Amino acid sequence: MKNITILGATGSIGTQTLDVIRREKEELKLVAISANKSYKKVIEIIKEFKPKYTVLMEENAFKIVEDFCIDNKIDTKVLKGMEGMIYISTLEEVNTVVTSVVGMIGLVPTIKAIESGKDIALANKETLVVAGELVISKAKEHNVNILPVDSEHGAIFQCLRGNKKEEVKNIIVTASGGPFRGKKKEELIDVKPEHALKHPKWNMGRKISIDSATLMNKGLEVIEAHFLFGVDYENIKVVVHPQSIVHSMVEYKDGSVIAQMATPDMKLPIQYALNYPNRKESQIEPLDFYKISNLTFEKPDMDTFLPLKLAYEAGKKGGVMPAILNGANEVAVDLFLKGKIEFLQIGDLLQECMNKFYKSMEATLENVISVDKEVREYLGKKYDI
């Protein structure tokens, strides 16, 4: 039996993780969850799974859930804030922490979980983007597995199993291309949030949907792959694959390419991470190769989708630059969703902040938190938010 904590249990990944646990009750037990403020969803989770601990970040949501548990004589202990997230990430009885919260908020609980010897099922890209070197070194120090939950890194992880790192030539990360695949800059001038949120293949949260539309999501995955698999940026390629059947590939020095293929369904990488190193029977629709008419691959347009280009630049620069990129992107996406900036301004703001805030500093926890705060305060004043 594996005991599980889910950070971000009410979001897209968290909800699908609950689906996996629901199907595998004999092997997986939900011990603790966190959420921001979706108290109605949290109450439903408490009713069904009866976790020992629940954390809410927002004060009003915390009070509502706490009152519900008291009134209904439910034993779930309700905690709040970052202190609560760290507490449930370091519980002695927990084996695996699923980090599916969005943004920098996942960084400190993930590091604390690693220091407590927990395996990490990682869906929070920002943790590795801003502090990848620190996270990976901590994982090695504490003999902890970092198990990627997203489809691309989960695919690469599987393609690398049983092979030697020195035999790898290139990692090939696939991208669906998002809702604006094939568009040029001039065609994206009047894009509204409702257009950018319509992903052709995946049902995701609002922030990651916008990142997919700008290809920033793929840029974050490139940086993540660099740290997860120890491969130079020159050897991490992005290809646009609109069918989303090939989830990523590894090219070896002898010319062989190993690809992981599956029906696009996030439950598969989640299930693989939670059951690692074993594979379990899945309810995911199997691939029918007779129905797959074609698989196509295209070169990404980095001029139109500037955030992808900037992610490569930030990764190669290293230090705190990925943290600057990430902080600026989180704010820029929020500004776009609120109608305060245009779609193409997202890339412009990333470029502006990278130029303004770069310092030759090691990516320590203190440094990345500090520079992230600087970027957010600057953009907050600029746009009065």
From Swiss-Prot:
GO terms for molecular function: 1-deoxy-D-xylulose-5-phosphate reductoisomerase activity; manganese ion binding; NADPH binding. 1-deoxy-D-xylulose 5-phosphate binds at residues 125, 151-152, 176, 199, 212, 217-218, 221. It comes from Clostridium botulinum (strain Langeland / NCTC 10281 / Type F). Mn(2+) binds at residues 150, 152, 221. Pathway: Isoprenoid biosynthesis; isopentenyl diphosphate biosynthesis via DXP pathway; isopentenyl diphosphate from 1-deoxy-D-xylulose 5-phosphate: step 1/6. Belongs to the DXR family. The keyword NADP applies. GO terms for biological process: isopentenyl diphosphate biosynthetic process, methylerythritol 4-phosphate pathway involved in terpenoid biosynthetic process. Keywords: Isoprene biosynthesis, Manganese, Metal-binding, NADP, Oxidoreductase. It holds the Pfam family DXPR_C. Disulfide bonds: none annotated. NADPH binds at residues 10-13, 37, 124, 126, 205. Its cofactor is Mg(2+); Mn(2+). It catalyses: 2-C-methyl-D-erythritol 4-phosphate + NADP(+) = 1-deoxy-D-xylulose 5-phosphate + NADPH + H(+). Catalyzes the NADPH-dependent rearrangement and reduction of 1-deoxy-D-xylulose-5-phosphate (DXP) to 2-C-methyl-D-erythritol 4-phosphate (MEP). SUPFAM superfamilies: 1-deoxy-D-xylulose-5-phosphate reductoisomerase, C-terminal domain (SSF69055), Glyceraldehyde-3-phosphate dehydrogenase-like, C-terminal domain (SSF55347), NAD(P)-binding Rossmann-fold domains (SSF51735). It comes from the Bacteria. This is 1-deoxy-D-xylulose 5-phosphate reductoisomerase. The keyword NADP applies. Its EC number is 1.1.1.267.
